[in-house]
């Protein structure tokens, strides 16, 4: 047991680098600006940006993908999100505007300080688990953010209510925008290369998911130097998140594979959901499908591309030590992986002619395919997304089936 008088670290509310779980806010901002899951305007190629660190030292940032390669193809947003392709997330952040990404994240419940930096889409600013899960719950709630509540009310021995939590509800996405994000989260489970595919296995919720008894999705995240592993899972009536890591940034997993959200954090949510859905008293409440808002064109939800399956690159989400060589993947993991020169061979496109000037807070981290073993902290948070539970009024939902759009 830990003595609270000497150790008061709250792992649920302690801030950590969220890795690729932060991409939710980049893509949600894009949906708000009229982008669609099927949009393939952005190319997965070599990019570099002129940046300055917190001390004002100029440098060049070269974000990498997990496999150290670039496909050279225009990637649909659905595939880019499902496969957690970093180059697309960084470019999308520049397209929609980092200040707008920050505004979306704040509207969706992120109160931690977010830095206006090109690396923010990769999770450069620390957040805590509870606010992240609360933000993801607004996607399941069709765009309505409901502030997470630990204690809803207190009743004394006579049955008198002595305390009742104030309900905080606000609309942050339209029905259609939220549905697009539900689709992107689900693609991580169903599409080739999706980083959340394991959740759909029989080890977790596969028996219900593939029988179309529940819709589900999620996003993995892995931070700088494999210090933090994340997974946030979303279902229509229950959202949960797991973080695995150490109390201090100096504590990290022995390898990138051990620190991957898909290997270390996803199983926590998966086993939790399996227990819930296996319970005869709980299953009727949480076995649910999404409704399809009016005006959704099924073609707008498509956009598959077979590319990669890892969810992280060398410095996926944190402040970097410029002395380490920004954005260069370790040679022992991917061979000679120095960024390609401007005159690149086919499938290794050239760098942009005019690098973007901005402030640097991070890049990304490659991974090794190893089985996870860790003795680090494992923390999780869950939020019921049923509006009846949180706000006293249930948002009307049409009973349209999602069979043709999800599984």
Specify the residue positions occupied by each region the protein language model found:
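Low-complexity, Gly/Ser/Thr/Pro-rich intrinsically disordered linker/tail segments
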Residues: 295-407
């Amino acid at each position: 047991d830990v003595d609270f008088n000497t150790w008061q670290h709250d792992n649920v509310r302690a801030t950590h680098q969220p890795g690729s779980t932060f991409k939710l806010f980049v893509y949600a901002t894009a949906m708000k600006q009229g982008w669609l899951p099927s949009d393939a305007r952005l190319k997965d190629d070599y990019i570099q940006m002129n940046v300055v660190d917190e001390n004002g030292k100029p440098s060049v940032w070269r974000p990498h993908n997990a496999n150290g390669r670039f496909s050279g193809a225009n990637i649909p947003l659905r595939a880019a999100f499902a496969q957690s392709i970093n180059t697309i997330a960084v470019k999308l952040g520049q397209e929609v505007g980092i200040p707008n990404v920050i505004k979306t994240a704040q509207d969706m419940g992120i109160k931690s300080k977010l830095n206006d930096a090109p690396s923010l889409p990769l999770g450069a600013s620390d957040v805590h688990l509870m606010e992240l899960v609360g933000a993801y719950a607004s996607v399941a709630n069709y765009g309505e953010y409901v502030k997470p509540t630990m204690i809803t009310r207190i009743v004394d021995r006579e049955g008198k209510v002595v305390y009742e939590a104030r309900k905080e509800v606000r609309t942050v996405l339209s029905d259609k925008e939220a549905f697009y994000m539900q689709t992107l989260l689900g693609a991580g489970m169903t599409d080739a290369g999706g980083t959340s595919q394991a959740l759909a296995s029989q080890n977790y919720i596969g028996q219900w998911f593939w029988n179309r008894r529940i819709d589900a999705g999620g996003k993995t995240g892995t931070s700088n130097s494999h210090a933090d592993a994340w997974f946030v899972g979303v279902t229509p009536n229950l959202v949960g998140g797991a973080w695995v890591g150490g109390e201090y940034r100096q504590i990290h997993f022995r390898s990138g594979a051990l620190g991957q959200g898909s290997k270390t954090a996803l199983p926590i949510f998966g086993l939790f959901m399996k227990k819930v859905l296996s319970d005869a008293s709980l299953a009727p409440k949480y076995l649910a499908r999404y409704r399809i808002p009016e005006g959704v064109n099924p073609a707008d939800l498509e956009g598959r591309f077979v590319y990669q399956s890892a969810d992280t690159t060398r410095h996926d989400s944190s402040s970097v030590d410029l002395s380490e060589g920004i954005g260069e993947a370790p040679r022992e993991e991917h061979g000679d992986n120095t960024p390609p020169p401007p005159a690149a061979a086919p499938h290794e496109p050239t760098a942009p002619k005019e690098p973007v000037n901005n402030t640097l807070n991070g890049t990304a981290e490659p991974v090794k395919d190893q089985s996870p073993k860790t003795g680090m902290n494992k923390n999780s948070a869950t939020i019921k997304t049923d509006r009846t539970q949180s706000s006293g009024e249930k948002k009307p939902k049409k009973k349209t089936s999602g069979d043709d759009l999800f599984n």
